[in-house]
């Protein structure tokens, strides 16, 4: 089973008591990717963002590959780099990555895009769009979205006055 390659690499990476060097995990994840286990790109992209292995160009390369094969975690991680890392900032590409997350019902990405529209730092503030996205995340089971919607109603972001009934 090709997916066992990815799992084996993950075990080697997480459990040093197995006696395998962490570098071997990267090699095995790459083999898994080339064998068609697209989710291996998630592990590579994520771990190349970690301090010990920090290599953002490699992280971006793997996350782009993952997103190409519809890995929504890759799209989300890529969006964070493009939106918030000054050295790699590409707001248009970052928003496209988050829109992919919305299309694929990836809650963290939906909430992330809602936050972008709520804050208005990267795009024009749009409370209506933020609300729409949070409602979608709520429908998918996000407790965080429920809290944020309630908070927005409580503080009057979604109505002229605070709406304590809707906040509950």
Q: Which functions belong to the PLM regions below?
A:
Residues 139-168:
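Ankyrin-repeat and related helical/solenoid repeat scaffolds used for protein-protein interactions
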Residues 17-28, 52-62, 86-97, 124-133, ...:
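Structural signature of tandem alpha-helical TPR/SEL1-like repeats
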Residues 1-2, 14-16, 35-38, 50-51, ...:
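Short helix-capping/linker turns of helical repeat alpha-solenoids
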Residues 9-14, 41-50, 75-84, 110-119, ...:
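Hydrophobic face of amphipathic alpha-helices that form TPR/SEL1-like repeat modules
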């Amino acid at each position: 089973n090709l997916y066992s390659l990815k799992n084996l690499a993950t075990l080697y990476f997480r459990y040093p008591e197995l006696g395998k060097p962490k570098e071997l995990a990267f090699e095995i994840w790459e083999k898994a990717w080339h064998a068609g286990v697209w989710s291996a790109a998630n592990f590579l992209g994520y771990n190349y963002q970690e301090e010990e292995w920090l290599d953002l160009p490699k992280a971006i390369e793997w996350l782009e590959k993952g997103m190409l094969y519809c890995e929504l975690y890759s799209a989300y991680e890529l969006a964070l780099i493009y939106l918030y890392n000054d050295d790699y900032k590409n707001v248009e590409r970052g928003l496209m990555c988050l829109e992919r997350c919305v299309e694929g019902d990836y809650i963290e990405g939906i909430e992330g895009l809602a936050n972008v529209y709520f804050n208005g730092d990267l795009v024009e503030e749009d409370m209506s769009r933020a609300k729409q996205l949070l409602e979608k995340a709520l429908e998918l089971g996000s407790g965080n979205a429920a809290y944020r919607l309630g908070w927005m109603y409580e503080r009057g972001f979604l109505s002229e006055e605070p709406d304590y009934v809707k906040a509950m």
